Amino acid sequence: MNHLRTAVLYTIISAVFLGLGYPLIMTGLAQWIFPRQANGSLIVRNGQVIGSKLIGQTFSGAGYFHSRPSAAGNGYDAESSGGSNLAPTNHALIQQVEQRAAAEQVGATKVPVDLVTASASGLDPDITPAAAYYQAPRIAKARHLPLAAVRKLIAEQTTARQFGLLGEPRVNVLAINLKLDQMH
């Protein structure tokens, strides 16, 4: 009976500490050390939340950089996060990629892969610099801007690898589109 009491007591203490104490301590530390990130890295404009730096959004106008396609529900639905689960040889996936490539095609240049394929999460907020530079002529034409100005903006908005070795260079689509709106 003594072992049973010890086991039950240990279970209750563990549940309280791990189920309540630890999450509250971590939440408090996150709010204290990284308050912006702990609250979702929200981007606010004119007092209104317009998005998160961490969750992609759909941009479809010719004057905006387009995000990666999303397989997460209807657009960038965070509640339906996930890839398409279609194999690379699946005819439906091949057809989707071909349609996206045809829609993005500009001249003889090959469309960067991240403009025609969804990510594993379906919520990526970033594109590669190659995908951004690929879209630059369309954006410059739609906004009546010099191509050099759009290319300069891409260079300024490109984030390097973290610590010089983690990840790949990337461009946050929401951030660069907001900068475009400020330019024009």
Curated annotation (Swiss-Prot):
Alphabetical list of Pfam families matching this protein: KdpC
Single Gene Ontology MF annotation: ATP binding
Membrane topology, as annotated: Single-pass membrane protein
Keywords: ATP-binding, Cell inner membrane, Cell membrane, Ion transport, Membrane, Nucleotide-binding, Potassium, Potassium transport, Transmembrane, Transmembrane helix, Transport
TM region(s), chain numbering: 6-26
Location in or out of the cell: Cell inner membrane
Disulphide bond pairs: none
Assigned GO CC terms: plasma membrane
Keyword Cell inner membrane on entry: yes
Protein origin, superkingdom: Bacteria
Function of the molecule: Part of the high-affinity ATP-driven potassium transport (or Kdp) system, which catalyzes the hydrolysis of ATP coupled with the electrogenic transport of potassium into the cytoplasm. This subunit acts as a catalytic chaperone that increases the ATP-binding affinity of the ATP-hydrolyzing subunit KdpB by the formation of a transient KdpB/KdpC/ATP ternary complex.
NCBIfam families: kdpC (TIGR00681), PRK00315.1 (NF001454)
Similarity comment: family membership: Belongs to the KdpC family.
Subunit structure: The system is composed of three essential subunits: KdpA, KdpB and KdpC.
Protein name: Potassium-transporting ATPase KdpC subunit
Source organism of the structure: Acidobacterium capsulatum (strain ATCC 51196 / DSM 11244 / BCRC 80197 / JCM 7670 / NBRC 15755 / NCIMB 13165 / 161)
Gene: kdpC
